[in-house]
Amino acid sequence: MKSDKELFGLAQMYVTLENEYRKASEYGLDELGEIKEGLENIRDTLFQKGYDIDKFLRYQEMYLTMSIGEYAKFIKTLE
């Protein structure tokens, strides 16, 4: 389960950074390079550790659609 917990955490971070990247692009903010580097680091980690990319994408979708209660229950299953 540790790898699932880490993979879900990476999916959360990726979704958050993607949203920040969109906002930074829209408003022309200086953080674009740092955010892009963060996204690349997550992608590198996924491949270096051999994570299941389909599962990563499912976790991203879950994170985007979960209610707070569903999120809390899911996190407990990963512990």
Where are these regions (language model features)?
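Acidic, low-complexity, intrinsically disordered interaction modules
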Residues: 19, 23-72
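Glycine-centered signal
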Residues: 1-2, 14, 57, 69
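N-terminal acidic leader/helix
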Residues: 2-28
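Short intrinsically disordered terminal tails
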Residues: 1-5, 73-79
